[in-house]
C-alpha cells in the first residue's frame, strides 16, 4: 500500500524484549448526497497498532502484534499503546475492525525460517466450531544465504488468505489504504508462491524472480453473507491466475555509470479480472494473455565531494 502518515515509538526492555507502537491516518472518504457535495461529510479512517518482539534465544524470536482500524480521527482507548485492542473494540460496539497476528522466526546459522498467522474478525466463542468467523491468512517461508559459497540469497515463500479477510461489515473500515491492501500485498481470497534469488557474479548483480498467484472474488455481497454464516466455496465465482518470471541484471560500465537489463515473461489467465466489482457473467469476456517484456536502463551515481 502507499505510504500514509504515522507517528509512533519503539522501546527496548532489556536484551530480549522490544515493544513498538504507531498511530496513523489512512485514506479519508468524502461522502456527498445526490444533490450536492456541499452537504457531504468526511469519514475518517485511522489505524493504531502495537507489536511485542521477544527473543527466547539468539536463534528463536516470536512477534505478537495487534492492530485496529476505526472511523474516528482519534480514539483515546487506542491512543494508549499498552491497552489490548480486541476487548476494547468489542466493548465500544462501533464495529471497529481489529486484527491479531503472531510470527515465529528461527535462525539456523545464517539461514532463516518463519511462519506468520494473521487473524481477522476473531470470534473466541466460535473458534473451534465448523462454522466460525475466524478469518485467517498465513505465510510460511525460508531464506538461505550463501548457498553456493558466494554472495547470494534465496527466498521462498507461500501465502494463503481466506476470502473474507481485510473486509468489514462497515465497508469504510476495510484493511486497505487508497485501494491497496495493507500487509500481504496479494490481498484476500488468494494464494501465492514466490521464489526470489539474488547473487553477485564479478561486477554483475543478478536478480531472478518467480511468482505464481491465484486470486478470487471478494464482493460486498460475499462479505455480508459471511457475517450471516453463509459461506462461499473458494474460487467458485471465478478467479485470475498469473505466473511471472523475471530476470534483472545490473553492472557498472565505468566509474559511477551502470546499466540494467530486465527480461520478463507473464502468463495471465482471465486477464483484467476485477475481484470486487465484476458480475459473474463477465468472466466469459476475459481473455488469457502471454507477454514477454524487455527493458534497458542507464544509471549514473553523482557524488559531490564538497558536501562531505
Residue map of PLM features:
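Surface-exposed coil loops of outer-membrane beta-barrel proteins
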Residues: 1-54, 63, 67-95, 99, ...
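Exposed, low-structure sequence patches enriched in small/polar residues
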Residues: 56, 60-68, 72-308
Amino acid at each position: 500500500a502507499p505510504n500514509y502518515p504515522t507517528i509512533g515509538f519503539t522501546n527496548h526492555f532489556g536484551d530480549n524484549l522490544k515493544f513498538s507502537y504507531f498511530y496513523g491516518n489512512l485514506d479519508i472518504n468524502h461522502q456527498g448526497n445526490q444533490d450536492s457535495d456541499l452537504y457531504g461529510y468526511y469519514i475518517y479512517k485511522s489505524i493504531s497498532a502495537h507489536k511485542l518482539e521477544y527473543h527466547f534465544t539468539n536463534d528463536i524470536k516470536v512477534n505478537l502484534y495487534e492492530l485496529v482500524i476505526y472511523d474516528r480521527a482519534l480514539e483515546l482507548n487506542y491512543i494508549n499503546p499498552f491497552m489490548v485492542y480486541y476487548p476494547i473494540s468489542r466493548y465500544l460496539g462501533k464495529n471497529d475492525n481489529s486484527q491479531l497476528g503472531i510470527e515465529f522466526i528461527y535462525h539456523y546459522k545464517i539461514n532463516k525460517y518463519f511462519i506468520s498467522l494473521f487473524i481477522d474478525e476473531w470470534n473466541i466463542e466460535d473458534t473451534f466450531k465448523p462454522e466460525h468467523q475466524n478469518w485467517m491468512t498465513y505465510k510460511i517461508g525460508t531464506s538461505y544465504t550463501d548457498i553456493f559459497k558466494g554472495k547470494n540469497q534465496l527466498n521462498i515463500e507461500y501465502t494463503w488468505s481466506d476470502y473474507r479477510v481485510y473486509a468489514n461489515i462497515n465497508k469504510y473500515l476495510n484493511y486497505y489504504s487508497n485501494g491497496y491492501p495493507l500487509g500481504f500485498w496479494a490481498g484476500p481470497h488468494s494464494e501465492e508462491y514466490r521464489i526470489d534469488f539474488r547473487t553477485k557474479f564479478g561486477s554483475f548483480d543478478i536478480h531472478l524472480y518467480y511468482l505464481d498467484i491465484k486470486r478470487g472474488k471478494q464482493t460486498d455481497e460475499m462479505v455480508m453473507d459471511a457475517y450471516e454464516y453463509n459461506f462461499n466455496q473458494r474460487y467458485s465465482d471465478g478467479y485470475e491466475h498469473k505466473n511471472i518470471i523475471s530476470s534483472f541484471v545490473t553492472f557498472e560500465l565505468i566509474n559511477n555509470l551502470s546499466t540494467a537489463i530486465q527480461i520478463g515473461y507473464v502468463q495471465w489467465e482471465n486477464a483484467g479480472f476485477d475481484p470486487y466489482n465484476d458480475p459473474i457473467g463477465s468472466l466469459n469476456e476475459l481473455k488469457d494473455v502471454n507477454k514477454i517484456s524487455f527493458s534497458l536502463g542507464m544509471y549514473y551515481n553523482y557524488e559531490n565531494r564538497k558536501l562531505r
